[in-house]
Amino acid sequence: MKELNRREFLTLTGAAVVALSLAGCGGPSTPPAPPAAPTGKEAELVAALNKVWKKKFDAGQVTHEQLTLNQEAQGAIKIQGGIFEDAKEPVHTLTTEDMQKLVGIQEWKTSLEKKYELGGAAGISEPTGEGAISLTFEYSCEDAEVQKFVDKIMGYSLSRKAEFISIYCPVVQGKTYMIATVFWNKKA
């Protein structure tokens, strides 16, 4: 796989935006496939997240007492996690092929935004100047780690309105990681 420098990364990102714009002008697109049923790890993680979320609710920091597992956004975070699974490394420099996969996230986002407002996410770093990204949270249901994970999600201020969470737990080099995003129903 070819590694991209910053200029190639930005050029490819711009090209992806243009391609998405042009695709929106064409015929009907195929809707994303429905997400898979949650695993035991995902269910355990939601329970641990909700313990922390409840404390935030009691302190008046969030709108809803708990997050409901809703895997409608899992397809998007699974695309991201799949890049690491395919590369078999928790720190990865994005390639042209990876960027093509990431274009699929926009389809999910467009579909979700018809019903939901999107909040924060946690589990994957922002790209560095060299286009490197990393999985940032190894799977854990321990209070301290879950608190850090929730704090990352809450980094986006509107996440306080979240009702739902989608989770994906990629396994890379024998370690399980956690990726999540939160969202809530659009008000009419």
Where are these regions (language model features)?
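Alpha-helix boundary/capping residues
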Residues: A16, Q80, F84, I153-S157
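N-terminal secretory signal peptides and thylakoid transit peptides that target proteins
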Residues: M1-L20
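Short, well-ordered surface patches within globular domains
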Residues: P32-K109
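A well-ordered secondary-structure block
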Residues: M99-A188
